[in-house]
Design a protein with these regions (language model features):
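Surface-exposed loop and turn segments in beta-propeller and other repeat-based domains
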Residues: 35, 79-102, 147-160, 199-228, ...
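Beta-rich, blade/repeat-based domains predominating
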Residues: 40-52, 96-117, 121, 158-177, ...
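Beta-propeller domains
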Residues: 57-91, 129-130, 143-144
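Blade-level signature of beta-propeller repeat domains, shared across WD40, Kelch, NHL, RCC1
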Residues: 343-382
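Short loop/turn segments immediately following beta-strands, especially the blade-tip
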Residues: 193-197, 259-270, 318-322, 380-382
Length: 382
């Protein structure tokens, strides 16, 4: 709906058909310790950490009418609606009585920009189905005042019917935002923050669509809906490297793609075709969240961290090795049931949510609407 040398742990075994395995590192290496930060009574997806260490999470309205959409995680692990209860007051049952323009409808992602703001991406599509008219938006909250500072609303030329705006990254100069649309027709969305104008790019391009022939597996078997439909999510994972390369891929797919952000800002935003600027960049298997560290957070801008839900793992790829670079396991743990989204603290600690998607009522008929989920952390090796 985001490090220096990396230590790998367990070799991957017993992978389902069609899955891309991460390579084990040296047997002498030890996995970083995985620690639980908080547990939730509802399905979490996004997490982000501000430059001062404040932690924020979000809860989409997928299988239940979540009582809180965006929250700050307090030091004792409890949560507090953020920025206030008012913005979190939307309920599906009373949606015709509350304005979707200034309430969180179905939040998929939260991202702190490192410059005093946290951004909330709201595709406004409960259960990933029909859009709530007037609901799709990107919201900037000022961390100093804890007040909403700006709302960027998206009309149907951007949030088209069937869309699901998934995750967002920001250009280094703070002038543009780049979003993935994992809905029925995948795309990237480029938003110029000064003007508020947004443009769909690579709309329907192969790099943003589900990859034919790819199936998502969990617990050693194919994951599908009770009616037999396969898991099909378009452009989802996204990360922006310090050198200006924007990386993304469909969730239902193995292939990684990249483009220079400058091409999106100039040609793409102007409506020009940027398909020729897209570069295939190897594979990373089925993934959900991406994170590229930077020097400010004791990271390495060449390392792409990847959540690997098929194997209950966090993996990494050294982008400096080019398209043939291998995916390696950082930490693999049975508790990482559908590792979803990354955040990184100012001390370099990496946070990751587990959204338990395979355990949800989407895929299990007898699953309760409310799904217990968790937030974890680990410290990558120096």
């Amino acid at each position: 709906m985001k490090l220096k040398s990396v230590i790998a742990a367990f070799a991957l075994a017993g992978l389902g058909a069609g899955m891309t395995a991460a390579l084990p590192a040296s047997a002498a290496a030890a996995a970083p310790a995985l620690q639980q930060v908080a547990k939730f009574g509802h399905q979490v997806t996004g997490v982000t950490v501000s430059e001062t260490g404040r932690i924020f999470v979000n809860f989409p309205r997928w299988t239940e009418d979540a009582p809180v959409s965006v929250a700050e995680v307090m030091k004792d692990g409890s949560i507090k609606p953020y920025p206030d209860a008012g913005w979190n007051a939307w309920r599906n049952a009373s949606g015709d009585e509350i304005s979707p323009a200034d309430h969180f409808v179905c939040v998929q992602s939260v991202v702190a920009d490192g410059h005093g703001s946290v951004w909330v991406l709201d595709p406004a599509a409960p259960a990933t189905q029909a859009l709530v008219p007037g609901g799709p938006k990107l919201v900037r909250i000022d961390l100093a005042t804890n007040k909403v500072a700006k709302v960027y609303a998206f009309d149907q030329s951007v949030a088209i019917p069937g869309s699901y705006l998934n995750d967002v990254r920001f250009s280094s100069d703070g002038k543009f935002a780049f979003m993935t649309d994992s809905g029925q027709r995948g795309a990237l969305v480029v938003l110029e923050l000064a003007s508020g104008k947004a443009k769909r790019v690579l709309d329907g391009h192969s790099s943003t669509q589900i990859e034919k022939g790819v199936q998502v597996h969990t617990d050693g078997k194919e994951l599908h809906y009770p009616d037999g439909r396969k898991v099909q999510f378009s452009a989802d994972s996204i990360a922006l490297a310090p050198d200006g390369w924007l990386y993304w891929k469909p969730l239902t797919g193995h292939k990684l793609y990249r483009i220079q952000a400058s091409a999106l800002e100039s040609k793409g935003f102007a409506g020009q075709d940027v398909a020729g600027d897209v570069q295939p960049f190897g594979e990373v298997g089925i993934s959900d969240g991406f994170w590229i560290g930077d020097k400010a957070t004791k990271g390495n801008g060449n390392l792409l961290y990847v959540t690997s839900p098929e194997t209950n793992a966090v993996s990494v790829r050294d982008l400096s090795q080019g398209p043939s670079g291998a995916l390696r396991t950082v930490v693999q743990d049975a508790r990482l049931r559908w590792p979803d989204t990354f955040g990184q603290g100012p001390d370099g600690t990496i946070y990751v949510t587990t959204s338990h998607i395979q355990d949800s009522a989407f895929f299990k008929k007898d699953a309760p609407p409310s799904l217990p989920t968790q937030l974890w952390k680990f410290k990558p090796a120096e």
